[in-house]
Amino acid sequence: MSDLLAGAYLAKGTIGNVGTPGAPIATFSLVVVPSQHSVTGTVIITQAVQGPDSHIVVPVTGKIYAAGLGKFTQLVSLKGQYVHSVPPPAIGSFLAEFNAHFAIDNAWNGVGGFSYYQHNVENVPVAAAKNLQTELA
């Protein structure tokens, strides 16, 4: 039972074209437990364009597995749900799905994509947070 969280660590970073005006960016903060192939945490999707999708917080769970894809050593998948509010003149809210997938190296840099209500972002960079890069080195 004590080995359940063996090797657990924190991973932080972004998925998306950071610096591109109007591009949606998914910022992640995840607890990774490689021995259990599990990932749990939070993703915050931001977009400079104002509207109901300009700031979304999503609790996520997922899987992490070793990969043998050249420079990419790990495959990660995330899923979660968040409350999406319908803009006026309609009234209401519903649970919307969030999904992400990426192929990364040991420093959490690579390529991936994510989708959320009526948005699909593919083939974008995955970058570890600057302070995480030095911790993993």
Residue map of PLM features:
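A short, structured loop/turn motif at beta-sheet edges
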Residues: V31-S38, Y65-F72, I104-N106
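Amphipathic hydrophobic-ligand
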Residues: G22-A26, D53-T61, G92-A96
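N-terminal glycine/threonine-rich, aromatic-flanked beta-hairpin/loop signature
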Residues: V32-V57
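Short, solvent-exposed aromatic-acidic interface loops
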Residues: V43-V49, K79-S85, S115-V121
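Mid-chain, well-packed structural core segment of small domains
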Residues: T61-H101
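Short, solvent-exposed loop/hinge segments that bridge or flank secondary-structure elements
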Residues: S2-Q36, S54
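Edge beta-strand at a domain terminus
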Residues: D53-Y65, N109-A137
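Short, cysteine-centered beta-strand-loop-beta hairpins and adjacent loop/turn segments enriched
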Residues: V18-G22, Q47-S54, S85-P89
